[in-house]
Amino acid sequence: MELGSADAFDRMGTLGVEEEFYIVDADGRPTSGIDDLVYGPEPPEPLAGRLDHELFQFTIETQTPLIEDPDEAGAAVSTVREALVDHAAAHGYRIAAAGLHPAAKWRELDHATKPRYQAQLDRIQYPQHRNTTAGLHVHVGVDDADKAVWVANELRWYLAPLLALSANSPFWNGFDTGLASARAKVFENLPNTGMPTAFDDFEEFQRFERRMVEYGSIDDRGELWYDVRPHTGHGTVEIRTPDAQTDPERVTDFVEYVHALVLDLADRYEAGESGTSVRRELLDENKWRATRYGRDTDFIAPDSEGVVSLVSFVETESDRLGVDGLRSLLDAESGTAVQRRIHEESGLDGLCEHLTLD
């Protein structure tokens, strides 16, 4: 049974960034490529040991090295991305980035043969068979297991605004879904996804994790795919909400804010602050608003007394935490709007080209 330990939570403020991408052909269309890029010759640094694939043979994931200084996160993300693009090009492929690839038709694409994924396909069936999603996952190290659980609980309200700012997947299976983040809704069809409930402490979380494995609900702890989770292997709090981003600067902006927010919440835990009691239904409603409308919505306040606009959220959080990236995200055209505009102007071919990273 693969379970983590409270001992893993021993470093505060370190960073790790995981990004999921699409392998595409010369025309920017999805194509199987993991045999060459993951299982072929050893990839160059900094990809060695930090390159894997996902459920489909056209999905690939990178991990940054451990980042000690948050100011170096942007360079780390760019270095890994550039190495992936070069690695793909050396084998005749290109790389694309979005929450969903607009030209990916899951019935026509091959699943990976890794036993772990084959077991998931057999157990979960239809929801996993069509899971062509790609996300951005940010890990922040936390130096105490109970603190990590408390921070993860508190982070839940902030996830909907983050999804709204990251929304980058209006198209799925070849059509416009009308959603800002169709990825969020496609992924939520899987078990053990979406907004988790709060846990009292690490012991309760680990007991839940253990029972899910013991009772056969999951094969390992990595199959708890909630929007935020204490990662009992890495000793981090992992935010999994954002869509994959085409622009690396947007990734850096998200990382800056998530890092500052986790450190702020950790300080509040140390100061003895009581946790915020927020109804799961309210959190789900806020996430739905972000999924459907992206930036064009308000969010129900944590105390359910009134709503918070995205502009107000960005201004308040930017000033409170001293970060600039949130304003940059808000000021730029959203990924969803860009995709729809390019699709209108240049069709699917133009959109596929836009999403490539070279």
UniProtKB/Swiss-Prot annotation:
GO molecular function: ATP binding; glutamate-cysteine ligase activity
Top-level lineage group: Archaea
Reactions accelerated catalytically: L-cysteine + L-glutamate + ATP = gamma-L-glutamyl-L-cysteine + ADP + phosphate + H(+)
Record has Protein biosynthesis as a keyword: no
InterPro entries: GCL_type2/YbdK_subfam, GCS2, Gln_synth/guanido_kin_cat_dom, YbdK
EC number(s) on file: 6.3.2.2
Key words, A-Z: ATP-binding, Ligase, Nucleotide-binding
GO biological process terms held by the UniProt record: modified amino acid biosynthetic process
Top-level enzyme category: ligase
Task of the protein: Catalyzes the synthesis of gamma-glutamylcysteine (gamma-GC), the main low-molecular-weight thiol compound instead of glutathione in halophilic archaea.
Family recorded in the similarity comment: Belongs to the glutamate--cysteine ligase type 2 family. YbdK subfamily.
NCBIfam families tied to this protein: gshA_cyan_rel, PRK13518.1
Entries under HAMAP family matching the protein: Glu_cys_ligase_2
Protein name: Glutamate--cysteine ligase
Phylogenetic placement of the source organism: Archaea, Methanobacteriati, Methanobacteriota, Stenosarchaea group, Halobacteria
Gene that this sequence comes from: gshA
